[in-house]
């Protein structure tokens, strides 16, 4: 057993914002990995452009000083330099745009999901529905998720981030997420999963996620939705497929073996 596997078996990773954090949270999905890699690649161009512009400004200030140039130059046209300062930015934009298009496409792509999670935002809580289990159960799994008040927090729980009912999903599985709202605009955002999607009343938005490792992932509503906007946390717990089915069995009554064979094909 490798050290990494040992750590994964002994601990549950917590992915959440930290005080004074400047960087990204650790990615748990291929989409978030792509976002971070694209950000790092883009920073090369941004830093290079900033350095070049600052150098040009410094050269202009030092070379075209009134004391050094009593008579200003009368250059009114330069075809070569105009072609250069038009073509180079265009090439830079193309270099940035092409990878971003591929990333945007992958964020919208839904690949044969085994679970559909319905998310409904309300003032000021989230509602969740698992309806795929209707194939082997009489009713869907529906529950609300409220923030745990500070006085009710247990040891080890986090202020303004913990909820009474977590979203539980399996790892290494394609999951479709359908998001809407019942009253005003909300936004379902989980940084570690690379998800930030608006919840709009009367409209159904769709995204997908493929979580690669077990852990607990924290997020919050990121659309100002009223006085308690800051008290709408999101907690997604990713577990193994067997643990997910065990959790589902404790919520609803169904045959465990039937679910494995009929629904998941294993």
From Swiss-Prot:
Cu cation A1 binds at residues 186, 221, 225, 232. Residues 65-82 are mitochondrial matrix. Cu cation A2 binds at residues 221, 223, 225, 229. Its main location: mitochondrion. Residues 1-43, 104-266 are mitochondrial intermembrane. SUPFAM superfamilies: Cupredoxins, Cytochrome c oxidase subunit II-like, transmembrane region. Its cofactor is Cu cation. GO terms for molecular function: copper ion binding; cytochrome-c oxidase activity. It is found in: Mitochondrion inner membrane. Keywords: Copper, Electron transport, Magnesium, Membrane, Metal-binding, Mitochondrion, Mitochondrion inner membrane, Respiratory chain, Translocase, Transmembrane, Transmembrane helix, Transport. GO terms for cellular component: mitochondrial inner membrane. Mg(2+) binds at residue 223. It is a multi-pass membrane protein. Binds a dinuclear copper A center per subunit. It comes from the Eukaryota. One of its GO terms (biological process) is ATP synthesis coupled electron transport. InterPro entries: CcO_II (IPR045187), CcO_II-like_C (IPR002429), CcO_II_C (IPR034210), Copper_CuA (IPR001505), Cupredoxin (IPR008972), Cyt_c_oxidase_su2 (IPR014222), Cyt_c_oxidase_su2_TM_dom (IPR011759), Cyt_c_oxidase_su2_TM_sf (IPR036257). Its EC number is 7.1.1.9. The keyword Transferase does not apply. The chain crosses the membrane at residues 44-64, 83-103. It catalyses: 4 Fe(II)-[cytochrome c] + O2 + 8 H(+)(in) = 4 Fe(III)-[cytochrome c] + 2 H2O + 4 H(+)(out). Belongs to the cytochrome c oxidase subunit 2 family. Component of the cytochrome c oxidase, the last enzyme in the mitochondrial electron transport chain which drives oxidative phosphorylation. The respiratory chain contains 3 multisubunit complexes succinate dehydrogenase (complex II, CII), ubiquinol-cytochrome c oxidoreductase (cytochrome b-c1 complex, complex III, CIII) and cytochrome c oxidase (complex IV, CIV), that cooperate to transfer electrons derived from NADH and succinate to molecular oxygen, creating an electrochemical gradient over the inner membrane that drives transmembrane transport and the ATP synthase. Component of the cytochrome c oxidase (complex IV, CIV), a multisubunit enzyme composed of a catalytic core of 3 subunits and several supernumerary subunits. The complex exists as a monomer or a dimer and forms supercomplexes (SCs) in the inner mitochondrial membrane with ubiquinol-cytochrome c oxidoreductase (cytochrome b-c1 complex, complex III, CIII). NCBIfam families: CoxB. This is Cytochrome c oxidase subunit 2. It comes from Phytophthora megasperma. The gene is COX2.
């Amino acid at each position: 057993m490798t050290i990494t596997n040992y750590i994964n078996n002994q601990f549950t990773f917590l992915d959440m914002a930290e005080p004074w954090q400047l960087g990204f949270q650790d990615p748990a999905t291929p989409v978030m990995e792509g976002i971070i890699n694209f950000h790092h690649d883009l920073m090369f161009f941004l830093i290079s452009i900033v350095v070049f512009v600052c150098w040009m400004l410094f050269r202009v200030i030092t070379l075209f000083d009134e004391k050094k140039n009593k008579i200003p130059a009368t250059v009114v046209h330069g075809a070569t330099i105009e072609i250069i300062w038009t073509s180079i930015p265009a090439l830079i934009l193309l270099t940035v745009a092409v990878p971003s298009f591929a990333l945007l496409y992958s964020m919208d792509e839904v690949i044969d999901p085994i679970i559909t999670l319905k998310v409904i935002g309300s003032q000021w809580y989230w509602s969740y529905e698992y309806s795929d289990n209707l194939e082997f159960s009489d009713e869907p799994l529906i529950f609300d998720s409220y923030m745990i008040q500070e006085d009710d927090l247990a040891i080890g729980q986090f202020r303004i981030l913990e909820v009474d009912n977590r979203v539980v999903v399996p790892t290494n599985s394609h999951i479709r997420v359908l998001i809407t709202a019942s009253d005003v605009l909300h936004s379902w955002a989980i940084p570690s999963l690379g998800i930030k999607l608006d919840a709009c009343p009367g409209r159904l938005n769709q995204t997908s996620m493929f979580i690669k490792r077990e852990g607990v992932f924290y997020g919050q509503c990121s659309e100002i939705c009223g006085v308690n906007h800051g008290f709408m946390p999101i907690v997604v717990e990713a577990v193994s497929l067997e643990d997910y089915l065990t959790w589902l069995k404790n919520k609803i009554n169904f045959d465990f073996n039937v679910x494995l064979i009929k629904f998941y094909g294993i």
